[in-house]
Amino acid sequence: MRSYTSAVDVATRRRASVRVAGPDARDHLQRLVSNDVDALQVGDACPALLLTAKARVIAPVVVWRRGEEDFLVLTEPELGETVRSLLVRMRLRAKCEIEPEEHESVLVFGGDVGFATDFPDAREALDAGLQPTVSDEELEARRVAAGVPRWGREIDDRVLPAEAGLEETHISFTKGCYPGQEPVARLHYRGHANRALRVLRLPAVPAYDAELVHDGKVVGRVTSAVPADGGALALAYVRTEVPDDAELAVG
């Protein structure tokens, strides 16, 4: 592996990785994930989702095309076996190998190393030999400020992609079929989500799952929060009918 010696900011990212390789690897992934794997050139990557038939999130992933027939699927550490077993179960007659791999992953802010990932203004690099300059706490603060949803906080098997703001980054509306495509497209073209993920500034750090109240009604819940400028920045799901500039009280 090539070793990089300079970067603006580097943060450790804990990952599980699954290799999918073989003559049918591209088609196999294209049939299962929400983004357009066919469009990836060698060296490119895209964030995507594995969804249930009802468009609930099974796992957020990043698909990296390492070679013509060699792909790496990256996900959260606790979801590695879930992703691997799903890819194996749905392989049917597809000619591809599906095996876990171990890598050290970092997020690189401001550099051009690595590949595109699901974190704004950052790229992801594997086994690059870079030393972290950003603590876990600072990375979490950057995540919340950027409105990036995280598995186990903003994303789980009850969440729709549109609610978490993942349509623009994780979904292609021009590719072929994949599990969950119909409800995703129906909501996108004909309806709207009842709640949406927002970044909020609050006077103090609230507890996880704290209620948000507007005009005497509970309109949302806090999913993540970090200290910021004497107060807090928080991610929360809020009812879409609540104006963006509405004052929300923590219940």
PLM features: what roles do these ranges have?
Residues 1-58, 67-68:
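Acidic, proline/glycine-enriched N-terminal capping motif
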Residues 1-5, 48-60, 92, 112-113, ...:
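Short amphipathic beta-strand starts and helix->beta connectors
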Residues 9-10, 14-19, 62-150:
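Acidic, low-complexity central loop/insert segments
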Residues 24-29, 80-84, 126-132, 206-210, ...:
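Short, conserved charged micro-motifs
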Residues 30-38, 79-81, 85-93, 189, ...:
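Short, intrinsically disordered, mixed-charge
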Residues 61, 159, 164-171, 181, ...:
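Glycine-rich, small/acidic residue-mixed loop/short-helix segments
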Residues 132-188:
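Aromatic-anchored, glycine/proline-accented short structural segments
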